[in-house]
Curated annotation (Swiss-Prot):
<dbReference type="InterPro" id="IPR020040">
    <property type="entry name" value="Ribosomal_uL6_a/b-dom"/>
</dbReference>
<keyword id="KW-0689">Ribosomal protein</keyword>
<comment type="subunit">
    <text>Part of the 50S ribosomal subunit.</text>
</comment>
<comment type="similarity">
    <text>Belongs to the universal ribosomal protein uL6 family.</text>
</comment>
<dbReference type="Pfam" id="PF00347">
    <property type="entry name" value="Ribosomal_L6"/>
</dbReference>
<dbReference type="GO" id="GO:0022625">
    <property type="term" value="C:cytosolic large ribosomal subunit"/>
</dbReference>
<dbReference type="GO" id="GO:0019843">
    <property type="term" value="F:rRNA binding"/>
</dbReference>
<comment type="function">
    <text>This protein binds to the 23S rRNA, and is important in its secondary structure. It is located near the subunit interface in the base of the L7/L12 stalk, and near the tRNA binding site of the peptidyltransferase center.</text>
</comment>
<dbReference type="InterPro" id="IPR036789">
    <property type="entry name" value="Ribosomal_uL6-like_a/b-dom_sf"/>
</dbReference>
<dbReference type="InterPro" id="IPR002358">
    <property type="entry name" value="Ribosomal_uL6_CS"/>
</dbReference>
<keyword id="KW-0694">RNA-binding</keyword>
<dbReference type="InterPro" id="IPR000702">
    <property type="entry name" value="Ribosomal_uL6-like"/>
</dbReference>
<keyword id="KW-0699">rRNA-binding</keyword>
<keyword id="KW-0687">Ribonucleoprotein</keyword>
<dbReference type="GO" id="GO:0002181">
    <property type="term" value="P:cytoplasmic translation"/>
</dbReference>
<dbReference type="GO" id="GO:0003735">
    <property type="term" value="F:structural constituent of ribosome"/>
</dbReference>
<dbReference type="InterPro" id="IPR019906">
    <property type="entry name" value="Ribosomal_uL6_bac-type"/>
</dbReference>
Length: 187
């Protein structure tokens, strides 16, 4: 039995779960998420908890058991609290700017890079003191779908990933970038 899969998911008071065959819908104060789970697993509500059970001990069922439990736990956490990722921009002249909902990045290219967030994702810019501003070096990506927040953050980071010599680029807040010594340092 999967160690992760057999743990029950606590259901907060302000979150409701709707089961329709393999379709699971979770509603909460932040919004609503829905997902179709594979036929190898069953989602059951037992009182104030959700339990993911597998139908049999086949290999595909064992493989998906823990995954489905984690996906469902992320859905519950997303509609109740939401997810946020912080990205930090480092480099002289590198900055982010919000124009409506579109994020415009000035990253040293000959043109500004525009990123339009998908539905359900909000982008904000902070300064170093944590105040919301229109132009700055810290980008907040937030939403209720953990996968969408992560993918949007990765798309923003991919515009200019941190380089190992000077550390310039876009990195996740707290990400460690291994530095290298340049050619002059080897001799």
């Amino acid at each position: 039995m999967s160690r992760i899969g057999k743990r029950p998911i606590p259901l907060p008071k302000n979150v409701t779960l709707t089961l329709d065959g393999q379709q699971v819908t979770v509603k909460g104060p932040k919004g609503q998420l829905s997902r179709v789970f594979p036929p190898e697993v069953n989602v059951v509500q037992e009182g104030e908890a959700i339990v993911v059970k597998r139908r049999d001990d086949s290999r595909p069922a064992k493989e998906r058991h823990g995954l489905c439990r984690t996906l469902l736990a992320n859905m519950v956490e997303g509609v109740s609290q939401g997810f946020t990722k912080k990205l930090e921009i480092q480099g002289v002249g590198y900055r982010a700017q919000l124009q409506g909902k579109t994020l415009v990045l000035s990253m040293g290219y000959s043109h500004p890079v525009e990123i339009v967030p998908p539905e359900g994702i909000t982008l904000e810019i902070e300064d170093n003191q944590g105040k919301k501003v229109q132009q700055g070096t810290i980008v907040l990506v937030s939403g209720i779908d953990k996968e969408l927040v992560g993918n949007t953050s990765a798309r923003i980071r991919a515009v200019r990933p941190p380089e190992p010599y000077k550390g310039k680029g876009i990195r996740y807040m707290g990400e460690f970038v291994r530095r290298k010594v340049g050619k002059t340092g080897k001799k």
